[in-house]
Amino acid sequence: MNYATFFSGAGIGCHGLKINGFDCILSNEYLEERIAIQRFNEKCDDEERYIVGDIREPETRKKIESILKQSKDNEGLDVLIATPPCQGISLANHKKTPTEIVRNSLILESILLTKKYQPKYFIYENVLGFLNSACSDSDGYDRGVKEVIDRHLKKNYYIERFIFNLKHFSIPSSRTRTVVVGIRKDLDKHPLSIYPKPEKIVTLKESIGHLKSLKKPREIDPDDSLHFYRPYDERMLPWIENTLEGQSSFDQNDKRRVPNQIIDGVLKVNEAKNGDKYKRQRWDDIGPCIHTRSDTFSSQNTIHPKDNRVFSIRELMILMSIPKTFRWVPKKTKLDTYEEIKKFELNIRKAIGESFPTRYLQLLSKNILEKHLLSQADVEAINKYFLDTQIFKKYSIELQESKPLNVELKETIEKCIFYNRLEKKSANPLKVCIGNNYKETKADIIFSTRKIDNKIPILELEKFYLYQLIDKKNLSLF
């Protein structure tokens, strides 16, 4: 199968499709230094398929349309992926200017290409507030992104959209994202059938605890040149060396060990505007959300749980599920010294911070390749069953061993349970229902581990009831 990807960055997310054998027929990215990384990984088999430039510029658009038209005239486009820039969309920017609204229309370009070339599948990924963000539509009116997607694509596509934290898919860092999946209606497959099922949450200790401890600035692991101790101003060492796991330097009582500066001979403590700055991470927690400035203590959640340093590039790669074989430099380039590494380091860190984790699109694209996906009617029947039964209210019966189920059906049920817990409220994308309760936060989507009287986790009990009761229904999949 083939795919086209827009706003593709360094190709980190869509590398998951390459792993599964998909052919990249087109990769569009604005920055040449990001496309260069894609070339190092041989993302496309033809140089002309790398298109550098603004998708809105006539010359860039002409090249894109030429490739997509050729594909449509031949075997057709299988998958279209779009991950437009999130500046002007992020919840950090509450008040959007007309310029930002136009910038948000970058997603419109992807929507219109989807509409024109009719790929079998489309995948849009963006930040938490993506769906409700204002976007200039093709008729000149400003609409929410969700409405624009439905207006142009709902006629020909089954569409699902969810907001969730990618840590639920064994990606060892916290990254809350909106993922929209559409499947062309003639395929008669429901989008939920290709969304990955939730997996084990992985802690920092489990993911990077095996790597060599680094004690000195510029120290490089002799077995892995991307695992190194990034140097910093030695005056900062007292600020972090006594900081405990989960603690910020600003939590210390000794002012000399709090980030400070000397002004006219007087020590002045820096203002602690953000509790995530100068913060040491915890081994037993999920890894932090990786940002573009992972090179400095003053950015968010960048300090190693044990060593007095920021995370190395290898550690960042693991936290973003980027495989060890992924290349950042040409094959002939040797990264034997820190001086050589330094030439590429910031570009690599920025590329990682901008990216979508490789593993999620690897899981999703693997599901696309499955031949026996559940149909729209099948999944609607399961979802209807959730509504028809009192499954979330029955907590009094004793747990018994459930009846064995077909593996495909079992996984679909698990996905239905997981994704049905994400209540999609147009007025509040941050709300996540846990039974009749919800927690709300700007920083993360919280999934409760609330227990009931018999100490069985609610998720397990929900599975049990569904397994027991679903056999009594005359659903199409039986």
Locations of the language-model features?
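Short loop/turn motifs at secondary-structure junctions
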Residues: 2, 21-23, 46, 76, ...
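SAM cofactor-binding core of SAM-dependent methyltransferases
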Residues: 4, 8-12, 16-56
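Conserved proline-anchored active-site loop of SAM-dependent methyltransferases
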Residues: 5-14, 75-93, 121-127, 180-182, ...
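Short alpha-helical patches at coil-to-helix transitions and adjacent helical residues
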Residues: 10, 177, 354-358
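Class I S-adenosyl-L-methionine
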Residues: 64-74, 87-277
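Short, solvent-exposed loop/turn segments at secondary-structure junctions
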Residues: 11, 32, 85-87, 128-129, ...
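Conserved acidic residues
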Residues: 51-59, 163-167
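C-terminal target-recognition/interaction regions appended to catalytic cores
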Residues: 235-478
